[in-house]
Amino acid sequence: MSLNVFWFLPTHGDGRYLGSTEGARHVDYGYLQQVAQAAERQGFGGVLLPTGRSCEDSWLVAASLIPVTQRLKFLVALRPGVISPTIAARQAATLDRLSNGRALFNLVTGGDPEELAAEGLFLSHEERYEASAEFTHIWRRLLEGETVDFAGKHIQVKDAKLLYPPVQQPRPPLYFGGSSEAAQNLAAEQVDLYLTWGEPPEQVKEKLAEVRDKAAAQGREVRFGIRLHVIVRETTEEAWQAADRLISHLDEKTIADAQAALARFDSVGQQRMAALHGGKKDKLEISPNLWAGIGLVRGGAGTALVGDGPTVAERIQEYADLGIDTFILSGYPHLEEAYRVGELLFPHLDLAQQPTPLHAVNNAGEVVANRYVPRKVSQS
C-alpha cells in the first residue's frame, strides 16, 4: 500500500528546543514559505496547518502559499460552532478553486473550554459534537451541490446553496480526529478519513477497530490516518540523543505548568496523550521507538518515532498494517527536519507522491577534487 505522507506548518512557533527561547526560530511568512516549499520538494503530499489562538489563521496562511507551491495540498481546519456551515462551505469551495483542487479540510471541534468560551462557544463536550454533526451534514451537502433546508437543535439554515462548486468532486475530502465515543460516531457517520494521535500500536488498533465497526453499521468505509512527530538520524543512537536534546531545557516547573493547563481540557484524546507520560521525564519510550517526550509541554500530538531511517520505516509499516494510509509528520525545527525525513526516511517508504523533479545544475552532491562525481551510496 502506497502511503500518503504529510508535513506540518509550524504557525504557532518553531525552534530547536521545547519550552525555551533558546534556539527559537523566528516564524514569519518567509519561513513558512520555506517549510512549505521544502516539504513539496522532498515529496510530502501535503501539509497540516494547526488551528487555535496560539496559531496564525490556517485559511489565510494556506491561501498565501498556494501561488508559491505547485502540488502541495493544504489541510486546514473547519471550526463548527464558531462559523456558519454555509459560509464555511463557500470558503472551502473558493480555497479549492484557488488551489486547483489542493484543499483538504480537518474538522476540529475543540477541546479547551476556556479557549472556546473566548470564541463565543459555550457548549458542553456532548453538545459540541451534536453541533459538529449538524454542521458537517450541511457543509457536505452544500459542497456536493445540494440546496439545503435544515432545522436542527443547534443550527438552522433555509435555502442554502453554493453558486460556485469546488474543483474536487463530489467535494474535497474531510478529515477528523477524536477519541470519545461521540467523536467516533461522528467519524463513522460523516467523515472520509479518521485521524488518531500517535498512541502505541495496540491502542491504535483497538481505536480503529471501533471506528471501522461503527462505520460498517452505517454502511460506510472510513480511511485512517495518524499524527506523529519524527526524529530520524543516520543512526538510532544519534536519534535518541536528538530526542534528549529537544527536551534538555525543560525544568519541572515548566512541565508542571504545561500539564496543569492541559488538564483543564475536556478532550478524551488529550487525556490519553497525558496518560502516556504521566508528566514525568523518565520512561518516555512507551513502545519500541515511540517517545512521549514532546507531550510533556505540547498539547495535541505528543509522541515521536525515534530512530534511523530503516527503523522508523519499520514502525510506520506497523501502523500501516493496521489499515493506516496517511501519516502526518513533523519535527523540530520543521525546515531542517523536512529535509532529514525526505533524505533519511523516504527512501525506505512506498510513497504515494514522489519528490518534485528538479532540473538542478548539480543534483549529485559536491564534485570530489574538482574532478569526480560522488559515488552513489546504496540504501540499506
From Swiss-Prot:
Its EC number is 1.14.14.5. Pfam families: Bac_luciferase. Keywords: Flavoprotein, FMN, Monooxygenase, Oxidoreductase. GO terms for biological process: alkanesulfonate catabolic process. PANTHER family: ALKANESULFONATE MONOOXYGENASE, ALKANESULFONATE MONOOXYGENASE-RELATED. This is Alkanesulfonate monooxygenase. Catalyzes the desulfonation of aliphatic sulfonates. Transmembrane segments: none annotated. Signal peptide: none annotated. HAMAP family: Alkanesulf_monooxygen. It catalyses: an alkanesulfonate + FMNH2 + O2 = an aldehyde + FMN + sulfite + H2O + 2 H(+). It comes from the Bacteria. Homotetramer. FMNH(2) which is absolutely required for this enzymatic reaction, is provided by SsuE. One of its GO terms (molecular function) is alkanesulfonate monooxygenase activity. Coiled coil: none annotated. Belongs to the SsuD family.
